[in-house]
Amino acid sequence: MEMEQEKMNLSQELSADSASYNCSACHGDETWSYNHPIRGRAKSRSLSASPALGSTKEFRRTRSLHGPCPVTTFGPKACVLQNPQTIMHIQDPASQRLTWNKSPKSVLVIKKIRDASLLQPFKELCIYLMEENNMIVYVEKKVLEDPAIVSDENFGPVKKKFCTFREDYDDISNQIDFIICLGGDGTLLYASSLFQGSVPPVMAFHLGSLGFLTPFNFENFQSQVNQVIEGNAAVILRSRLKVRVVKEPRDKKTAIHNGLSENGLDTEGGKQAMQYQVLNEVVIDRGPSSYLSNVDVYLDGHLITTVQGDGVIVSTPTGSTAYAAAAGASMVHPNVPAIMVTPICPHSLSFRPIVVPAGVELKIMLSPEARNTAWVSFDGRKRQEIRHGDSISITTSCYPLPSICVCDPVSDWFESLAQCLHWNVRKKQAHFPEDEEDS
């Protein structure tokens, strides 16, 4: 009786918003999610499961990707103690759709540099955006410095309308409504690096080599871009890692060489600190040294292991199909909230890759016994040296990358596994003839 009374008292303490929450997978009630859109940047964009979209019937699902809500009573007397402060309202990933609070007016076009095959698609896309949709198009300054674009007189009138920016110098985070990438997976990673806070929706066209993260084909770009502008598109929120590198104070020359003079430099008790948003992975390796790397890995302040080998990869589910997959990690769907820890050629027969909850904080430091320094890179960029006393703190960022889907998050992912990585491709075994089966 006392336990039941305590449970009733705790239930009454829940706020009205908390009490109104129902899991659509368990209760079949979609009204709550329709009336409570997940908001993005103010006055620009949002995600919702709005039934007003033209293709609503195409994306409604009978089951949530989150799975059913667990029953929290166990046997006749036991139950889980309810804590109102830990209740989270999370929308079903299968129902996330892009919608606009106001019509989009500006678009950032990211083109793979020094690729002549992309010049014609780039020109066609920009002309369509400017002349047909009256969009303000942003491009990186070095894109317009391409000799093929400079020498094209027919493209001159359009080129004058571009808004240009320079990486690491100009902040365009509040000017861009959505992003279009032309190239391979690297263009999407580059787009992520440009936005260290909220990221505009990204539409990625497969015009590169691999294209696991770029699901759109360019042949029908006009109709596909129109759907995005109209707000009729499925979206997958690709989680990113928030990485903070804290370094012991050293001479000024070394600090600048290590990239610490860039935007984001901070001081922390006399130490130097930088923060990055990472879409794929953080890689800590032994660099040019011939010795094994020797780094300690902490989880929420507790030492869990010491990595002795070529290094360690800390990746998002999106990054699980990149370097981590080559190192033997499992491929994890981007909607799974998790962080992967994968050793690189460990000098151990029992060091297997692990998956930890998305909410933990990992901290990586050189072991006191380490014979050499280590090197760290973030999505293959900003590579720098890590010495004794330096630390790398990693947790899930609150700023995901909203990637626009062709169909839906599940279908697109398995399509990429099949088409790009040729997952489980094998010649099928032939069946026995009927006469052999009878014998």
Curated annotation (Swiss-Prot):
Protein name, as recorded = NAD kinase
Q: Which GO terms describe its molecular function?
A: ATP binding; metal ion binding; NAD+ kinase activity
> Which cofactors are reported in the record for this sequence?
a divalent metal cation
Q: Which InterPro entries match?
A: ATP-NAD_kinase_N, ATP-NAD_kinase_PpnK-typ_C, NAD/diacylglycerol_kinase_sf, NADK
Lineage of the source organism?
Answer: Eukaryota, Metazoa, Chordata, Craniata, Vertebrata
Is Cell membrane tagged as a keyword? Answer: no
**Keyword Transferase: yes or no?**
yes
**Chain positions found as Phosphoserine:** 46, 48, 50, 55, 64
Q: Which gene encodes it?
A: Nadk
So what family is this one in? Belongs to the NAD kinase family.
Provide the E.C. number(s) assigned to this enzyme.
Answer: 2.7.1.23
EC class, as a word, reads transferase
Pfam families listed in its UniProt record: NAD_kinase (PF01513), NAD_kinase_C (PF20143)
Instruction: Could you list this entry's UniProt keywords, alphabetically sorted.
Output: ATP-binding, Kinase, Metal-binding, NAD, NADP, Nucleotide-binding, Phosphoprotein, Transferase
Reactions the enzyme catalyzes: NAD(+) + ATP = ADP + NADP(+) + H(+)
